[in-house]
Amino acid sequence: MSSSMNVATMQALTFSRRLLPSVASRYLSSSSVTVTGYSGRSSAYAPSFRSIKCVSVSPEASIVSDTKKLADASKSTNLIPIYRCIFSDQLTPVLAYRCLVKEDDREAPSFLFESVEPGSQMSSVGRYSVVGAQPAMEIVAKENKVIVMDHNNETMTEEFVEDPMEIPRKISEKWNPDPQLVQDLPDAFCGGWVGFFSYDTVRYVEKRKLPFSKAPEDDRNLPDMHLGLYDDVVVFDHVEKKAYVIHWIRLDGSLPYEKAYSNGMQHLENLVAKLHDIEPPKLAAGNVNLQTRQFGPSLDNSNVTCEEYKEAVVKAKEHILAGDIFQIVLSQRFERRTFADPFEVYRALRVVNPSPYMGYLQARGCILVASSPEILTKVKQNKIVNRPLAGTSKRGKNEVEDKRLEKELLENEKQCAEHIMLVDLGRNDVGKVTKYGSVKVEKLMNIERYSHVMHISSTVTGELQDGLTCWDVLRAALPVGTVSGAPKVKAMELIDELEPTRRGPYSGGFGGVSFTGDMDIALSLRTIVFPTACQYNTMYSYKDANKRREWVAYLQAGAGVVADSDPQDEHCECQNKAAGLARAIDLAESAFVKK
């Protein structure tokens, strides 16, 4: 849902992700049409969800139906994508995710990524959404202990390493996809690693100055890194109204390519069948009966008191005045209990706070529900992109007020100075892994509008050095200056002293590293963390004996502290950011729980 929608239209609006116009029309007309574009294969699905399939919109044969092309490719590559293209007018990303992951299977690694592109005037729905489930492999790291689960070979190994990020890197180095075959796929993430990197993964890089032994208390015991290797993904193209159902065949020599192709085709058929389920899963409609652009009530349950946070700000200012640092981001973690399911909260969040990086990620130990506005780092065809967002103002009630607040934001010396400082820090991070002279500031101090706030944004780019990979870029970027400070390492040392608990996923990153070597990692801001290991003896029943579990939701937010910061203002900024995110929980509870 576009953030530009008039607030008045949000009242009593039914969630529409359950029923598209094309599906609703089935109830109004008895006629239906089945389109089959895959030669030699008939469709035999129930009329409640008729199969609408095509290999390609164009008449040209795809790799799926061209075995000669596959045989030729197998001589020079060990990764081959096969896909089926289906019309998406009966299928939404939310429904596709629920087709692949059952409602009660909250421990199953899986993801749903969506996007709303920001603009100076309004936002628009991003072109692609991506869904994935059942990874072929998983890597889970806790400090220096790493567990690797190879689900295809049914093996599990455990080891202690200095840098767990080296494990997926070494596996990725063996990939050799055929560039011509990849060109047939949509310009989006189409398979590879997906997961999250916690803030504390910086300790793998800065072992001496930021050791785990000096880290704050780890009171949640969440993984520091979780990655799944997804051979199967579904990519929705919202412009062309179709979905690519993709499976990657990995040719490791254990099978002849003919057998690997046959197995891959059967796997693809099974994946398509899940999306054309005879009895599609039901998604509760829900009613949007809240003012979605309002902030929720302030959250009082924090890992620090108001006085403790303000005292930390005062100590940080002392270090700034002493010349130790220029700026630091101090955060606090709020806690809230809810009977709304995390997936229901995600459905609400995509209405309340649409952002460029919308994500629902089920990982080991936790579920992330995210609406991040900011890239942590992006690598595409050896071009590195860093987009600092710093400097924030609330949105106005109308266009005139928006313009006034935008002007005030760009004239605010404190906000602009902080932004320029972080742009310089971003240039430094990008410069560590780029070719000499290639770093550019392509955009400087533009305004981007989101549902509740507007930000000052800049874009820093550079060309990746020869011999380096996206994993080197990630190591150089984690964590970005907008969530740590400047100078970065010294600011993080002070964060260890001033914050009482480890940050975990907050201010780390989540996203994907594709089979092609591209990377798109979002900064874990505006991200709700639901630990899956937490159990409470507070189960109760609603009418119809529909049992619900009580979840604990963690909402963490920070404020940038500089020399002239006011401790009370910084505390209020943290509260306001968290309250805006908590609005999604309010909406989920009113729409799905309090019926």
From Swiss-Prot:
Transit peptide: 1-54
Quaternary structure (record): Heterotetramer consisting of two non-identical subunits: a beta subunit and a large alpha subunit.
Pathway the protein acts in: Amino-acid biosynthesis; L-tryptophan biosynthesis; L-tryptophan from chorismate: step 1/5
Function: Part of a heterotetrameric complex that catalyzes the two-step biosynthesis of anthranilate, an intermediate in the biosynthesis of L-tryptophan. In the first step, the glutamine-binding beta subunit of anthranilate synthase (AS) provides the glutamine amidotransferase activity which generates ammonia as a substrate that, along with chorismate, is used in the second step, catalyzed by the large alpha subunit of AS to produce anthranilate. Plays an important regulatory role in auxin production via the tryptophan-dependent biosynthetic pathway.
Tissue: Expressed in the central cylinder of mature primary root zones, including pericycle and early lateral root primordia, and vasculature of cotyledons.
Residues binding L-tryptophan, per UniProt: 115, 356-358
Sorted UniProt keywords: Acetylation, Amino-acid biosynthesis, Aromatic amino acid biosynthesis, Chloroplast, Lyase, Magnesium, Metal-binding, Plastid, Transit peptide, Tryptophan biosynthesis
InterPro entries assigned: ADC_synthase, Anth_synth_I-like, Anth_synth_I_N, Anth_synth_I_PabB, Chorismate_C
GO biological process: L-tryptophan biosynthetic process; regulation of auxin biosynthetic process
Annotated cofactor note: Binds 1 Mg(2+) ion per subunit.
Annotated binding of chorismate, by residue: 391-392, 506, 526, 558-560
Expression induction: By ethylene, methyl jasmonate (MeJa), wounding and infection by a virulent strain of P.syringae pv maculicola.
Listed name of the protein: Anthranilate synthase alpha subunit 1, chloroplastic
MF terms (GO), sorted A to Z: anthranilate synthase activity; metal ion binding
Transmembrane segments: none
Binding-site residues for Mg(2+), renumbered to this chain: 418, 573
Subcellular location field: Plastid, Chloroplast
